[in-house]
């Protein structure tokens, strides 16, 4: 009886495997979103570190609006993707930078294309990891 209970608890409190499993409340909660982002980027953990430094694992604010950069309001979402420079390409790829899935997916694309360069402004935070 204890072993099945452990599996139930693990599946309940582990990071969601599917983005659709995240509710708005889950996306607004940095702990829940942080677990999801770390699982999502398990093969490229530097991207999870960057997400922490860029947005403190926040995609939506408490008001439900997308998190925007303090220095540059064109930076959006958990990965702080700049819409001025990247929205057209993201749209061509069928990605919405304001959606969690689109923001995470586009960050993967950027990382594969340019490495960590797009996030160099926050490198003092994640560069030592």
Model regions and ranges:
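Export/targeting segments at the very N-terminus of extracytoplasmic proteins
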Residues: 2-57
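A short, structured beta-strand-centered segment in the mid-to-C-terminal lobe
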Residues: 92-102
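Short, solvent-exposed loop/turn and secondary-structure capping segments
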Residues: 61-64
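Stable alpha-helical elements in mature extracytoplasmic
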Residues: 29, 33, 43-47, 74-78, ...
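Charged phosphate-binding loop/patch that engages nucleotide di/tri-phosphates or the phosphate backbone
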Residues: 14-16, 27, 116-129
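Glycine/charged-rich beta-loop-alpha catalytic/anionic-binding loops adjacent to active sites
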Residues: 31-34, 87-91
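Sec-exported extracytoplasmic/periplasmic mature domains
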Residues: 38, 42, 46, 52-56, ...
């Amino acid at each position: 009886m204890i072993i099945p209970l452990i599996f139930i608890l693990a599946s309940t409190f582990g990071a969601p495997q599917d983005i659709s499993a995240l509710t708005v409340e889950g996306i607004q909660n940095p702990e829940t979103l942080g677990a999801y982002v770390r699982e999502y980027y398990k093969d490229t953990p530097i991207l999870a570190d960057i997400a922490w430094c860029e947005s403190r694992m926040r995609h939506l604010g408490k008001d439900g609006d997308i998190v925007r950069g303090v220095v540059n309001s064109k930076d959006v979402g958990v990965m702080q993707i700049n819409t001025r420079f990247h929205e057209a390409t993201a749209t061509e790829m069928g990605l919405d930078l304001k959606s969690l899935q689109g923001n995470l997916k586009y960050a993967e694309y950027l990382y594969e294309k340019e490495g960590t360069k797009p996030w160099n402004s926050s490198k003092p935070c994640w560069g030592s990891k």
